[in-house]
Design a protein with these regions (language model features):
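Short, solvent-exposed loop/turn and secondary-structure capping segments
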Residues: 32-34, 43-45, 81-83, 152-156, ...
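Surface-exposed beta-strand-turn/loop segments characteristic
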Residues: 43-49, 112-117, 137-214, 239-282, ...
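Outer-envelope beta-barrel architecture signal
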Residues: 30, 65, 99-103, 136-140, ...
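Short strand-turn segments of transmembrane beta-barrel domains in outer membranes
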Residues: 70, 95-131, 142, 158, ...
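A beta-strand signature from Gram-negative outer-membrane beta-barrel systems
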Residues: 4, 17, 55-106, 153
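Outer-membrane beta-barrel transmembrane strands
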Residues: 86, 92, 109-110, 121-132, ...
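Periplasmic N-terminal accessory/gating domains of Gram-negative outer-membrane beta-barrel systems
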Residues: 1-28, 36-61, 70-76, 110
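Surface-exposed, extracytoplasmic segments of Gram-negative outer-membrane nutrient-acquisition systems
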Residues: 324-371
């Protein structure tokens, strides 16, 4: 729903809203508050390292536990500083806002057709329970939600060598000499002109990822209003977001030796296709990877509000909040096992289709579908941890003037 606001765009991760960009300023430049309090942020980014970022991940919070969102795109004296792009305040329910007994439970299933192996239905359960006592002077509220989602995604990736001018003659660039000893000049169709800019494919591959995400949210609120002018509130918020991502990758690398290619017209030219032939010994790269991480946010706070005589208002607020991201696997936050099948005779990437097509021809006896031909190529075990903590106490005041010269 934030995307409906002018100047606000959503950055998505695996199809779900994660961070926001406001007025062109990225997530690092937007300050996120929870009930007016600055929240810590943690995450493991690409699952291999803790990023140097304070951007808040909205994927940690379920929409069912949010009562409203305020977006401030300009500064105000009553708001914390630090939001260059915006200040976003997430508001959660309060029991005295709706006196009496209130309760709701929602159960639904999510049917995701993106799964490679099956199309499972995953559960989403949420509930809210609120009640007031003592003629509406004491209120207790509890919210909870559980969400599980399984999805898959397929992706094509390509790496490129730095941009070349059509007049360059360096390693990796297209040959200029018609008598090139490799014969690549004759196998280059519609070669870029000397003043054109182009890039050469360095590598290409397919990634197939299965995602399993579990999100748990909960909040407890105690609100007391002994008099019409005094209100006390204590709340505790908990969120947990666990993500497992299993990725299988297959790809090719180019040596830029015996190549054939076709190119689009300049001045910025790109390949229609790029292929290369090899002597025995070239490999087809295969990788299996697992990223398993969990982010946990905890916040406990209190708020005391007093409406004094003559329009005077004082608000004392404090909270202790932590955000922690760590691996759930005993082998670390990210594991990658690399292997190779040696015996690639030729390889080609065709960029003329909606999804670029990689084709590989193997030498006899080196079939890619024969597990006996797979050789280990290297493993990587990475471990990352991030923790952010905020202890904050604030005292705010206001005075409503009631004079004829102030409108």
């Amino acid at each position: 729903s934030l995307q409906r606001i002018t100047g606000v765009s959503i950055d998505r991760n695996s199809g779900e809203g994660s961070t926001v960009t406001v007025r062109g300023f990225g997530p690092d430049f937007n300050l996120v508050l929870l009930n007016g309090r600055q929240m810590p942020a943690s995450g493991l980014g690409s699952c291999c390292e803790a990023p140097a970022s304070r951007s808040f991940d909205f994927g940690n919070l379920a929409a069912e536990g949010v009562a409203g969102v305020e977006v401030y795109k300009s500064g105000r004296a009553a708001l914390p500083t630090g939001g260059i792009g915006s200040v976003i305040n997430i508001k959660t329910p309060r029991p005295l806002d709706r006196p009496g007994f209130k309760g709701s439970i929602g159960v639904k299933g999510v049917y995701d057709t993106s799964r490679f192996e099956s199309t499972p239905v995953t559960p989403e359960i949420s509930g809210i329970l609120s009640n007031t006592f003592g003629d509406g002077t004491i209120g207790i509220l509890a919210t909870a939600s559980y969400q599980r989602r399984k999805a898959s995604q397929a992706q094509f990736n390509a790496g490129w060598r730095e941009g070349y001018l059509g007049s360059e003659n360096n390693w990796g660039s297209l040959p200029l000499d018609a008598n090139d000893w490799r014969g690549n000049f004759a196998r280059t169709e519609n070669r870029p002109d000397p003043t054109d800019i182009y890039q050469v494919t360095q590598n290409a591959g397919y990634d197939f990822t299965d995602l399993d995400r579990e999100r748990i949210n909960g909040q407890l609120v105690l609100q007391v209003k002994p008099t019409d002018t005094l209100s006390l509130l204590v709340d505790y918020t908990y969120s947990q977001n666990t993500i497992n991502a299993r990725t299988s990758s297959v790809g090719v690398w180019f040596n830029h030796d015996q190549t054939s290619s076709s190119w689009t017209d300049g001045p910025a030219a790109g390949p229609n296709f790029y292929s290369e032939a090899f002597a025995p010994g070239k490999d087809l790269a295969i990788t299996g990877a697992l990223a398993a991480n969990r982010s946990i946010n905890r916040s406990i706070g209190g708020n005391l509000e007093w409406d004094g005589p003559g329009g005077l208002r004082l608000v004392l607020d404090g909270h202790h909040s932590t955000a922690e991201s760590k691996p759930t696997s005993p082998y670390g936050s990210n594991i990658a096992v690399g292997s190779a099948i040696f015996g690639v005779q030729s390889q080609k990437v065709d960029f003329t289709t909606d999804m670029p097509v990689i084709s590989v021809n193997m030498y006899p006896g080196s079939a890619a579908d024969n597990a006996a031909n797979i050789r280990p190529a290297g493993n990587a075990f990475r471990n990352a941890y991030m923790r952010d903590e905020i202890n904050e106490v604030s005292l705010k005041g206001g005075y409503d003037f009631d004079a004829s010269f102030i409108k």
